[in-house]
């Protein structure tokens, strides 16, 4: 689960501003530099979601769909645990987003508590997926309430489902994760969606939503792989087309590199991310040098005309 959750806004004039935050460790803090980089990526590059690597930490940020609040500048960020699955985090995002929108307030203390509860909810959800026993205990509590409310038929149905569905749910999630790790993305999607159906049967709607979102995300991976292959070829062509008379073409490298970084983040491909980040840094340096060369060329021309 994430180490921290941060709700912030980006003001067009003043930049990012933290609305609420909650950290599992007190010494964990999101720095102004990270928020500034998020602001640049969200606003200047118009990225809906993005990830940053800084000081051995991973930070994920995504724009919140807050039209119902008449706000178009709310963002939610997480500091990730080492080795944490980004696909799972993205799948949880929708649940957290909904809670924030439903309970949004100008009271900072209340919003901090809301983020704390959201993080606890994430932990509970992930524990349920790993331990069928926890789901069974939840079902028992729910059926007791149904019986107290006189809902005998519904209680019996839920009791019957609770006999084997939690184990079938856990087994299906395990299969889905194995398919995902082995890069069988279509099979993984099918298993995640099947697991979501099991979760709905026993009225675990948060788990169902999480698994459905994860299945849909994994289902996009084959297309992302095709896009990545196309971008790699496009990048190679741009570089091969650059010669001494067309140095300005270095500018064309940045956009496909940025997109390749985003795709690599989806696959948790840290080796490619490091290589692409280095390539971007060198390309940006080349762009600066070309700019300096053009300025020098212009000044040389002006001086020669005066001689």
Model-derived segments and spans:
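Extended amphipathic alpha-helical coiled-coil/heptad-repeat regions
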Residues: 127-307
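Extended hydrophobic
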Residues: 8-9
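Acidic, low-complexity cytosolic segments
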Residues: 2-3, 13-142, 148-151
């Amino acid at each position: 689960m994430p180490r921290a959750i941060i709700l912030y806004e980006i003001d067009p004039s003043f930049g990012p501003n933290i609305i609420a935050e909650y950290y599992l460790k007190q010494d964990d803090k999101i720095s102004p530099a990270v928020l500034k980089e998020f602001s640049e990526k969200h606003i200047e590059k118009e990225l809906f979601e993005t990830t940053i690597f800084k000081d051995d930490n991973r930070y994920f940020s995504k724009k919140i769909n807050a039209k119902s609040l008449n706000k178009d500048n709310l963002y939610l960020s997480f500091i990730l645990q080492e080795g944490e699955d980004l696909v799972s985090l993205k799948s949880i995002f929708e649940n957290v987003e909904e809670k924030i929108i439903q309970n949004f307030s100008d009271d900072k203390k209340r919003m901090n508590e809301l983020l704390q509860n959201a993080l606890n909810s994430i932990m509970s959800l992930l524990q349920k997926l790993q331990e069928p026993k926890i789901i069974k205990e939840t079902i028992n509590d729910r059926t007791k309430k149904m019986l107290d409310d006189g809902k005998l038929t519904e209680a019996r149905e839920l009791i019957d489902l609770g006999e084997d569905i939690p184990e079938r749910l856990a087994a299906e999630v395990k299969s889905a994760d194995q398919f995902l790790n082995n890069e069988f993305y279509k099979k993984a999607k099918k298993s995640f969606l099947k697991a979501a159906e099991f979760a709905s049967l026993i009225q675990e709607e948060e788990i169902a939503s999480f698994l459905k979102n994860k299945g849909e995300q994994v289902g996009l991976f084959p297309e992302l792989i095709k896009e990545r292959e196309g971008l790699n070829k496009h990048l190679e062509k741009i570089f091969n087309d650059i010669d001494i008379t067309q140095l300005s073409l270095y500018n064309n490298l940045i956009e496909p590199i940025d997109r390749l970084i985003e795709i690599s983040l989806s696959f948790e491909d840290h080796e490619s991310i490091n290589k692409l980040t280095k390539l971007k840094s060198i390309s940006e340096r080349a762009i600066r040098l070309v700019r300096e060369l053009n300025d020098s060329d212009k000044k040389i021309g002006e001086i020669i005309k005066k001689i």
